[in-house]
């Protein structure tokens, strides 16, 4: 069977080594003659897995001791509601820096729970570019400042941290979590849906500073209350054990490759190769300014809808799957998360060259 590369924005490609291990252990996990999906989440073996997964994640990201790690459900959309329910306190208001669809959606949901100010930081001229990031002069009036450092639809990534003074910085890292080095101590809370870089859909990571826990409004549902979830080790209800197990395997896999430093180098190399090709030809166009081009989601177009549709169809037939751009933007999108090997990017570029030669 010929090799297939999955460029889906999510659920996304998983590391082949992780899938192979999961396949090998599927019917007999930890010599129990049963699947990890069938064991008690409160049993000794799964509790050990949960504990080790947290230790491995702490090692990967150098997470300080005064941060709690939660493995929750409901996706990033669930956190759009959970964050204001837990973090809106005395000031009763938050600032949302919007740069695309997902940050704007988060702001819209947060308005159900408090006073939300929104500032659009995306400049839309000939190229998409992030504008002002210094909000230190106004941030103190807010309980927290929220932003999304990588917008999957447009392929816009923010590499510099917003300046927010002493305010709490909250980041939706669903699409670039574990893709590059970050200083966790600069954030009050980080959250991410798993289905791009962490594991399969169905589990959500929250990394939250301890002093931000314990302030949820009284009407906060139990499953969204960080204090209750933290005290219950993310097991106030039965967690998605198989998804958690796969995340644990991904963490081990990333450590075996050399950790975040090595992963970042690989991601830089993959993205640079693809962007260099896009720069070399007028046949395709990327709409994002160089300084904000995403390493995870590379968008491009021929500026011809019929030609774009033909590209996607022929690419799929060639084993390059899920390259259709989001309906909001159109064109094509290659999502090249951690699990995408350099071989996949090279195969895509080879196809793009062939398609250009046949259709220019």
UniProtKB/Swiss-Prot annotation:
<comment type="pathway">
    <text>Amino-acid biosynthesis; L-serine biosynthesis; L-serine from 3-phospho-D-glycerate: step 2/3.</text>
</comment>
<feature type="binding site">
    <location>
        <begin position="237"/>
        <end position="238"/>
    </location>
    <ligand>
        <name>pyridoxal 5'-phosphate</name>
    </ligand>
</feature>
<feature type="binding site">
    <location>
        <position position="172"/>
    </location>
    <ligand>
        <name>pyridoxal 5'-phosphate</name>
    </ligand>
</feature>
<dbReference type="InterPro" id="IPR015422">
    <property type="entry name" value="PyrdxlP-dep_Trfase_small"/>
</dbReference>
<keyword id="KW-0664">Pyridoxine biosynthesis</keyword>
<dbReference type="GO" id="GO:0005737">
    <property type="term" value="C:cytoplasm"/>
</dbReference>
<comment type="similarity">
    <text>Belongs to the class-V pyridoxal-phosphate-dependent aminotransferase family. SerC subfamily.</text>
</comment>
<keyword id="KW-0663">Pyridoxal phosphate</keyword>
<feature type="binding site">
    <location>
        <position position="152"/>
    </location>
    <ligand>
        <name>pyridoxal 5'-phosphate</name>
    </ligand>
</feature>
<dbReference type="InterPro" id="IPR020578">
    <property type="entry name" value="Aminotrans_V_PyrdxlP_BS"/>
</dbReference>
<dbReference type="InterPro" id="IPR015424">
    <property type="entry name" value="PyrdxlP-dep_Trfase"/>
</dbReference>
<dbReference type="Pfam" id="PF00266">
    <property type="entry name" value="Aminotran_5"/>
</dbReference>
<keyword id="KW-0032">Aminotransferase</keyword>
<dbReference type="InterPro" id="IPR015421">
    <property type="entry name" value="PyrdxlP-dep_Trfase_major"/>
</dbReference>
<keyword id="KW-0028">Amino-acid biosynthesis</keyword>
<dbReference type="GO" id="GO:0006564">
    <property type="term" value="P:L-serine biosynthetic process"/>
</dbReference>
<comment type="function">
    <text>Catalyzes the reversible conversion of 3-phosphohydroxypyruvate to phosphoserine and of 3-hydroxy-2-oxo-4-phosphonooxybutanoate to phosphohydroxythreonine.</text>
</comment>
<dbReference type="GO" id="GO:0008615">
    <property type="term" value="P:pyridoxine biosynthetic process"/>
</dbReference>
<feature type="binding site">
    <location>
        <position position="42"/>
    </location>
    <ligand>
        <name>L-glutamate</name>
    </ligand>
</feature>
<keyword id="KW-0718">Serine biosynthesis</keyword>
<protein>
    <recommendedName>
        <fullName>Phosphoserine aminotransferase</fullName>
        <ecNumber>2.6.1.52</ecNumber>
    </recommendedName>
</protein>
<comment type="subunit">
    <text>Homodimer.</text>
</comment>
<feature type="binding site">
    <location>
        <begin position="76"/>
        <end position="77"/>
    </location>
    <ligand>
        <name>pyridoxal 5'-phosphate</name>
    </ligand>
</feature>
<keyword id="KW-0808">Transferase</keyword>
<comment type="pathway">
    <text>Cofactor biosynthesis; pyridoxine 5'-phosphate biosynthesis; pyridoxine 5'-phosphate from D-erythrose 4-phosphate: step 3/5.</text>
</comment>
<dbReference type="InterPro" id="IPR022278">
    <property type="entry name" value="Pser_aminoTfrase"/>
</dbReference>
<feature type="binding site">
    <location>
        <position position="102"/>
    </location>
    <ligand>
        <name>pyridoxal 5'-phosphate</name>
    </ligand>
</feature>
<feature type="binding site">
    <location>
        <position position="195"/>
    </location>
    <ligand>
        <name>pyridoxal 5'-phosphate</name>
    </ligand>
</feature>
<dbReference type="GO" id="GO:0030170">
    <property type="term" value="F:pyridoxal phosphate binding"/>
</dbReference>
<feature type="modified residue" description="N6-(pyridoxal phosphate)lysine">
    <location>
        <position position="196"/>
    </location>
</feature>
<keyword id="KW-0963">Cytoplasm</keyword>
<dbReference type="GO" id="GO:0004648">
    <property type="term" value="F:O-phospho-L-serine:2-oxoglutarate aminotransferase activity"/>
</dbReference>
<dbReference type="InterPro" id="IPR000192">
    <property type="entry name" value="Aminotrans_V_dom"/>
</dbReference>
């Amino acid at each position: 069977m010929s090799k297939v590369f999955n460029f889906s924005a999510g659920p996304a490609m998983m590391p082949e080594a992780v899938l192979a291990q999961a396949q090998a252990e599927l019917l007999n996990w930890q010599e129990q003659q049963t699947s990890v999906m069938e064991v008690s989440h409160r049993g000794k073996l799964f509790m050990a897995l949960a504990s080790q997964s947290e230790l491995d994640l702490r090692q990967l990201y150098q997470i300080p001791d005064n941060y709690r790690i939660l493995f929750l459900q409901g996706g990033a959309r669930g956190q759009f509601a959970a964050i204001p329910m837990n973090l809106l306190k005395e000031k009763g208001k938050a600032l949302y820096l919007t740069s695309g669809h997902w940050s704007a959606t988060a702001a819209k949901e947060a308005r159900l729970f408090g006073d939300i100010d929104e500032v659009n930081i995306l400049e839309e001229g000939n190229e998409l570019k992030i504008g002002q990031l210094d909000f230190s002069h106004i941030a103190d009036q807010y309980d927290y400042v929220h932003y999304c450092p990588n917008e999957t639809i447009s392929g816009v990534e923010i590499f510099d941290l917003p300046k927010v003074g002493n305010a709490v910085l909250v980041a939706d890292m669903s699409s670039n979590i574990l893709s590059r080095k970050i200083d966790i101590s600069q954030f009050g809370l980080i959250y991410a849906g798993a289905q791009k870089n962490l594991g399969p859909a169905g589990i959500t990571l929250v990394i939250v500073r301890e002093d931000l826990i314990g302030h949820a409004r009284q009407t906060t549902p139990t499953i969204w209350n960080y204090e209750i979830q933290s005290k219950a080790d993310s097991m106030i209800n039965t967690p998605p054990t198989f998804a958690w197990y796969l995340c644990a395997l991904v963490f081990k896999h990333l450590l075996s490759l050399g950790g975040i430093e090595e992963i970042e180098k690989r991601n830089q190399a993959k993205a640079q190769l693809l962007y260099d090709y896009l720069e070399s030809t007028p046949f395709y166009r990327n709409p994002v300014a160089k300084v904000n081009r995403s390493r995870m989601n590379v968008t491009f177009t021929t500026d011809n809808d019929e030609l774009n549709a033909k590209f996607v169809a022929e690419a799929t037939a060639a084993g390059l799957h899920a390259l259709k751009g989001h309906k909001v933007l159109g064109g094509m999108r290659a999502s090249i998360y951690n699990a995408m090997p350099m071989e996949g990017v090279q195969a895509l570029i080879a196809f793009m060259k062939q398609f250009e030669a046949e259709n220019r």
